């Protein structure tokens, strides 16, 4: 009988301690603990605008985050199409070589708005099978800034999947963290299928549905 009472006593103690530990743990969850795991950087995630976003430019935006360090963070919006423009308008005059494939200058190419910074800078976000000397490789895709890739795309010799993006989105050190603190942004797992295959209008709902839930 006594052994049963002791057993019940220690069971009750363990339950109380477990509850206290769980409560303390949840109360002290750090800000970088999302969906059951820690993250040390927003790089290689989707940054997804929430309904609390106050900047109209980023309403229902999803951003592929490319870097996050002590100097800040930057990425490319991938669901804000601008429209189609002739290849000729995407190539800087100083880069146009004499007699280089001028027949392609009028080929129209779809482009996207990547953010309000360096709005004339072109980034080609694409699948990894395509490479040239300026290609930078990331986890699930690559980025090329060499204008010659545009000619390859116009000739159907470019990457299988791509987005041509003008400008980028950038934050100073601590700025993005402040915006996340007031729930203007939430993180979501990066998915190349959403980036390249989904229609623009469907990208935000898909990314938001897959977003991390803050504890």
What is the predicted function of each stretch?
Residues 10-22:
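Bacterial N-terminal signal peptides
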Residues 3, 22-23:
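A detector of low-complexity, intrinsically disordered, Ser/Thr/Gly/Pro/Ala-rich segments
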């Amino acid at each position: 009988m006594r052994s049963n009472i002791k057993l019940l006593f220690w069971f009750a103690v363990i339950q109380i301690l477990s509850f206290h530990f769980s409560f303390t743990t949840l109360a002290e969850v750090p800000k970088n603990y999302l969906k059951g795991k820690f993250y040390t950087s927003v790089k290689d995630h989707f940054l997804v605008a929430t309904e609390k976003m106050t900047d109209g430019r980023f309403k229902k935006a999803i951003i592929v985050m490319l870097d996050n360090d002590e100097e800040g963070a930057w990425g490319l919006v991938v669901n804000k199409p601008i429209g189609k423009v002739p290849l000729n308008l995407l190539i800087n005059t100083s880069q146009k070589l004499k007699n280089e494939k001028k027949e392609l200058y009028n080929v129209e190419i779809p482009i996207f708005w990547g953010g309000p910074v360096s709005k004339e800078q072109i980034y080609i976000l694409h699948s990894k099978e395509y490479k040239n000397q300026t290609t930078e490789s990331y986890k699930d895709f690559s980025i090329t800034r060499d204008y010659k890739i545009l000619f390859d795309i116009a000739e159907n010799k470019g990457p299988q999947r791509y987005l041509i993006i003008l400008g980028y989105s950038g934050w100073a050190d601590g700025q993005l963290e402040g915006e996340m603190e007031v729930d203007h942004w939430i993180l979501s797992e990066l998915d190349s299928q959403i980036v390249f295959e989904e229609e623009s209008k469907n990208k935000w709902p898909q990314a938001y549905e897959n977003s991390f839930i803050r504890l």
